[in-house]
């Protein structure tokens, strides 16, 4: 079971590879606002645990296990952002809120939130009622 820090690294590596075609230690460190030496230690651990293959000075690649988890972590993050947007959380708070909660929810809870988002998309009146409620509470 990966730790929250492991998840953050895998998620960033997945995003970097998806966007740039590669992920370097320096890019990961910059994206996570940590020291490159910390990333190197984590990458070595992720290599040992089978999430990626790391060769010093040659870069890294996700294994199928790492790619599958990376994709799921990105989807979780996007789902939580979508959910918070739907329930009317202020845009400038969404990213930090997602970062604060994403590692503390079980995959079962994430799946239920996905179901709820789908219900809300299929029933726009629910979202309108939430918007009206937010307006009423912000008086």
From Swiss-Prot:
Localization: Cytoplasm
Binding locations of Mn(2+) 1: 8, 99, 102-103
GO biological process: intracellular manganese ion homeostasis
GO molecular function: DNA binding; DNA-binding transcription factor activity; manganese ion binding; protein dimerization activity
SMART domains in the cross-refs: HTH_DTXR (SM00529)
GO CC terms of this entry: cytoplasm
Keywords, comma-separated and alphabetical: Activator, Cytoplasm, DNA-binding, Manganese, Metal-binding, Repressor, Transcription, Transcription regulation
Tagged with keyword Metal-binding: yes
Domain HTH dtxR-type: 1-63
Binding site for Mn(2+) 2: 11, 77, 99, 102
InterPro entries, alphabetized: DtxR_MntR_Metal-Reg, Fe_dep_repressor, Fe_dep_repressor_sf, HTH_DTXR, HTH_tscrpt_reg_MntR, Iron_dep_repressor, WH-like_DNA-bd_sf, WH_DNA-bd_sf
UniProt cross-references to Pfam families, sorted A to Z: Fe_dep_repr_C, Fe_dep_repress
Record comment: activity regulation: DNA binding is strongly activated by Mn(2+).
Family stated for the protein in its record: Belongs to the DtxR/MntR family.
Function in brief: Central regulator of manganese homeostasis.
Subunit structure: Homodimer.
UniProt-recorded name of the protein: HTH-type transcriptional regulator MntR
Organism: Lysinibacillus sphaericus (strain C3-41)
The organism's taxonomic lineage, starting at the top: Bacteria, Bacillati, Bacillota, Bacilli, Bacillales
